[in-house]
Amino acid sequence: MKTESLTISLEEMMEAGVHFGHQTRKWNPKMAPYIFTKRRGIYILHIFKTARLLAEACEFSANAASQGKQFLIVGTKYQAADLVSAAAKKARCHYVNQKWLGGMLTNWSTIETRVTRLKQLEDQENAGVLNQLPKKEAAVLKRQLIQLRKYLEGIKYMTRLPDIVIIIDQQKEATAVEECIKLGIPTICLVDTDCDPDLTDMPIPANDDARSSIRWILDKLTTAIREGRNRVT
């Protein structure tokens, strides 16, 4: 079944700057098949190939969502952080947008105990318990709560490893990529001209720096996920 999100406009892609790669001095030869040309020292990605691969990723995501699969969206660079959280919440996905903690997936049991601690502290805060404690003790717990929220808020309701991980910047999130490979978790990854497409299951050649590009692609992927959830099998 085709999804509404697969109506991909090349004009919209151009307007969002999806096709702009990095400077020609900064590239990975493995991205050569996805590069159309270079202009003023900048690589230009082959927009038709990007559109095709994005369409495939959207269809894959919709089908996975229809089967109840769980998604994790990862993007911790400053220009992507708020876009990641907004898109994830809209599509009911888990997300990491501040810092990838080493072992977030490969050492999930330890991370899960921290998530449990976050929930405990939030329950205590909501019940007014923290305000009834001695000032020093309350201050320590409140600092702990702030820290846990900062890094774990997006996976607070994740009770198991995700089935699919969407990654915004392959190089920035190298540890996340490595953990997914080690655990055999499929990845959908934006790959700019300096990335290695072989490290991801479903590469989407695209500008991974511009907010407009990140927003546009996230919107397509999360729209597909939402549509898939509406036709759960």
UniProtKB/Swiss-Prot annotation:
Give the gene symbol: rps2
User: What CDD domains does the annotation carry?
Assistant: RPS2
> Is Ribonucleoprotein one of the keywords UniProt gives this record?
yes
Q: What GO annotations for molecular function exist for this entry?
A: structural constituent of ribosome
Instruction: Give the primary localization class.
Output: plastid
One Pfam family matching this protein:
Ribosomal_S2
Q: Which UniProt keywords apply?
A: Chloroplast, Plastid, Ribonucleoprotein, Ribosomal protein
Report disulfide bridges, numbered on this chain: none
Annotated coiled-coil positions are: none
* Protein location: Plastid, Chloroplast
Asked if Ribonucleoprotein is a keyword of the record, the answer is yes
Name of the protein described by the UniProt record: Small ribosomal subunit protein uS2c
Instruction: Cite a single GO BP annotation.
Output: translation
GO cellular component terms given for this protein:
chloroplast; mitochondrial small ribosomal subunit
Family membership noted in the UniProt record: Belongs to the universal ribosomal protein uS2 family.
